[in-house]
Amino acid sequence: MNWRNLVSDDITSEAQTIAVGQLRAFIERIERLEEEKKTIGDDIKEVYAELKGSGFDSKVVRTIIRLRKKEDHERQEEEAMLQLYMDALGMS
């Protein structure tokens, strides 16, 4: 082997080491975030249990939260379609 091959092998090895380190860092970040997501999910469940214990309907609250995430025009369009379908089925 000549010196060019040795240098090339060293660069390749170093690049692989860096890539493995980056991959490991990404995976560890994702794992930490997944754990945080689980913790937040557990916290949200506790809040729903508290509101249910206070006499509120958790299903209705979930609907309100879903609707609040939408733009006004999206929500109004959805409500209009719902009303149209209910009228068509004689449900209003």
Swiss-Prot record:
MF (Gene Ontology): DNA binding
Pfam family, one: GapR_DNA-bd
Family: Belongs to the UPF0335 family.
Protein name stated in the entry: UPF0335 protein BMEI0289
Organism, as annotated: Brucella melitensis biotype 1 (strain ATCC 23456 / CCUG 17765 / NCTC 10094 / 16M)
Phylogenetic lineage: Bacteria, Pseudomonadati, Pseudomonadota, Alphaproteobacteria, Hyphomicrobiales
